[in-house]
């Protein structure tokens, strides 16, 4: 199959996926994570209910997907760090923040492009064994096809199911560039069903210890892929500019 044929097929699938798409929440085919296995994970919540994932990339900033806030009000949303069991308060490890400001860089919801957002927290996170910062790749860095990565988050184990009480994770493989788009990193699971599904937007794709992607959307049935992640390396210079010039905190 030629590159043009693949891109044409992807364009058609993108159009059909947008018609029935919703924010992403589920990790399909995953395993239960251990406590503090992914201490950089953020649970973004509305009135105590998880609706998107994210990653702490600075003591004052969480990286997530811009699409998460297409139908959510940031004024009543909170960011929770250090969470593990969403049904417990976990007072010793959990830190909860309001959103001070939001930054995005040309998000295009029609084409699912530039689906990345930085959330400035109302105060600095207290870094502990349960709350750590996830490093980012350098500007324009690439991740090779065949690289093994991980994606983790709270969510049901099947489409339409209930949210998971604990975070789950799945090992995924980066697909060749001609099966993806230049602005994305795409992944799949080679031997079985697995990956992101409805509602898991914003959770990071971690490859070799770096946040190479932000979960954006998936083509086809949940767990069958390919899954599309915003390519973080294209935004590193912009991200650094935001982190180095934060807005004022709450009065």
UniProtKB/Swiss-Prot annotation:
Result after altering residue 68 to S: Loss of antibiotic activity
The organism's place on the tree of life at top rank: Eukaryota
Location of region: Possesses antibiotic activity: 46-70
Glycosylation-annotated residues: 126, 140, 171
Disulfide bonds: 52-68, 149-207, 180-186, 197-222
PTM comment, free text: Cleavage of the N-terminal propeptide which is composed of 7 amino acids occurs in two steps. The initial cleavage of 5 amino acids is followed by the cleavage of a dipeptide to produce the mature form.
Stored InterPro entries: Peptidase_S1_PA (IPR009003), Peptidase_S1_PA_chymotrypsin (IPR043504), Peptidase_S1A (IPR001314), Trypsin_dom (IPR001254)
Localization: Cytoplasmic granule membrane
Gene Ontology, cellular component aspect: azurophil granule; azurophil granule lumen; azurophil granule membrane; extracellular exosome; extracellular region; extracellular space; intracellular membrane-bounded organelle; membrane
Function, in words: This is a neutrophil granule-derived antibacterial and monocyte- and fibroblast-specific chemotactic glycoprotein. Binds heparin. The cytotoxic action is limited to many species of Gram-negative bacteria; this specificity may be explained by a strong affinity of the very basic N-terminal half for the negatively charged lipopolysaccharides that are unique to the Gram-negative bacterial outer envelope. It may play a role in mediating recruitment of monocytes in the second wave of inflammation.
Family membership noted in the UniProt record: Belongs to the peptidase S1 family. Elastase subfamily.
Protein name: Azurocidin
Taxonomic lineage from the root: Eukaryota, Metazoa, Chordata, Craniata, Vertebrata
Gene coding for it: AZU1
């Amino acid at each position: 199959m030629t590159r043009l044929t693949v891109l044409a097929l992807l364009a058609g699938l993108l159009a059909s996926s947008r018609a029935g798409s919703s924010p992403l929440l589920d990790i399909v085919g995953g395993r239960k994570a251990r406590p503090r296995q992914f201490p950089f994970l953020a649970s973004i919540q509305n009135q105590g209910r998880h609706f998107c994932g994210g990653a702490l990339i600075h003591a004052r900033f969480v990286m997530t997907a811009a699409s998460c806030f297409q139908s959510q009000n940031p004024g009543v949303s909170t960011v929770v760090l250090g969470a593990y069991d969403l049904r417990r308060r976990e007072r010793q490890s959990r830190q909860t923040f309001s959103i001070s400001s939001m930054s995005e860089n040309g998000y295009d919801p029609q084409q699912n492009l530039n689906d990345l957002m930085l959330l400035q927290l109302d105060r600095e996170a207290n870094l502990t064994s349960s709350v750590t910062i996830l490093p980012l790749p350098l500007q324009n860095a690439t991740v090779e096809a065949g690289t093994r990565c991980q994606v983790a988050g709270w969510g049901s184990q099947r489409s339409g199911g209930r949210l998971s009480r604990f975070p789950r994770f799945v090992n995924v493989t980066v697909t060749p560039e001609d099966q993806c788009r230049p602005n994305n990193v795409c992944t799949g699971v080679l031997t079985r069903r697995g990956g992101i599904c409805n509602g898991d937007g914003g959770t990071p794709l971690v490859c070799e210890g770096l946040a190479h992607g932000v979960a954006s959307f998936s083509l086809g049935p949940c767990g069958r892929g390919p899954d599309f992640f915003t390519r973080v390396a294209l935004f590193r210079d912009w991200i650094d500019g935001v982190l180095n010039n934060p807005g004022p905190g709450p009065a």
